[in-house]
Regions:
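A charged, amphipathic alpha-helical module
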Residues: 56, 60-189
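Trp/Phe/Arg-rich N-terminal binding region typifying the photolyase-homology
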Residues: 1-72, 178-179, 183-184, 188-294
Length: 294
């Protein structure tokens, strides 16, 4: 059970995945739900203004529900704090750029996901900054100049629910997962909210820029993948496709073509779910893939 849902007064949701949209209808029977309606694309006429009104609607619902008033100055302070958090998370993710990496992809994924349960953002920032500094020191003392194992980048769907069957398995088979170009990776963290603009407008602009597969078209994902492959010195790409996420599945053909043709790297797509029934098959395919990486 999710502790957030149990202890929450209301749920803030958005219309990304179709399954989630229907789930929120059921959740609304238990909690007050505010559902933000996403525009179908980033660049369509009126997309930004539409999304800005959705952000305003959230603010108004929070004020009505909690009987409070949210000022622009309070929003600016929250933006500044969240930008600091983004920087701390991004710096931690980018430890994977070191070669050889002093941290496993399993730890990266676990630390980031577990810290989402930290309510005190100052505490979260402090922990991540401290752990990042520790890992940089460890790299200088014990890893720098040593041979590196094959370096794998994960792309596609969120990996939190399949971390053991995919991320851990890759590393047990002899490769290092050094980066994540997916929903739980540094994608959103690289782009802070503009602190010089009207706060509502800045929030709307920032979240409309996220390279999510539900947006059509979504060229920013290829640009981000291109940069991350180079920055992390990647040897191969593993795309995780959860069975219910059709938008990522559709994009996978373009991703495969880009990785193999444009970047000249090995690529494999793993179609899976949260069950363990396909573990043996995944192990076999990942084992063969990692052998290709040398």
């Amino acid at each position: 059970r999710c502790p957030f849902f149990y202890f929450s007064d209301m749920v803030l949701a958005e219309t990304t995945c179709d399954g989630k949209k229907k789930m929120y209808e059921l959740m609304s029977e238990l909690k007050h739900c505010h559902i933000m309606q996403l525009p179908p694309g980033k660049t369509g006429r009126g997309a930004l203004e539409f999304w800005k009104q959705e952000v305003i609607s959230v603010k108004e619902d929070l004020e009505d529900f909690y009987h409070i008033r949210i000022t622009d100055e309070q929003i600016r302070k929250a933006i500044h704090l969240r930008n600091r958090e983004r920087k701390a998370v991004l710096d931690f993710f980018e430890i994977g750029r070191l070669k050889p990496t002093p941290i496993t992809g399993y730890e990266i994924n676990t630390v980031i996901s577990s810290n989402e349960f930290t309510v005190d953002l100052e505490e979260k920032i402090k922990y991540l900054e401290h752990r990042t500094a520790e890992l940089k020191e460890l790299y200088e003392k014990e890893y720098k100049g040593k041979p590196s194992r094959p370096r794998v980048l994960i792309t596609g769907c969120p990996t939190t629910g399949v971390i053991d069957k995919i991320v851990r398995q890759i590393e047990e088979l002899g490769a290092d997962v050094v980066g994540f170009e997916n929903c739980c990776g540094p994608r959103e963290k690289k782009d802070p909210i503009d602190e010089t603009k009207d706060p509502i407008t800045a929030i709307a602009e920032k979240y409309l820029r996220v390279n999510c597969s539900v947006m059509s078209p979504n060229p920013g994902r290829l640009e981000a993948l291109d940069a991350q492959i180079d920055e992390y010195q990647v040897d191969g790409v593993v795309e995780v496709l959860l069975q219910a996420c059709h938008t990522f599945a559709i994009e996978s053909d373009a991703i495969r073509t880009f990785v193999t043709k444009e970047k000249g790297l090995p690529y494999i797509a793993i179609n899976t779910d949260y069950s363990s029934g396909d573990q043996a098959q995944i192990n076999t395919r990942l084992g063969a893939f990692i052998e290709m990486l040398g």
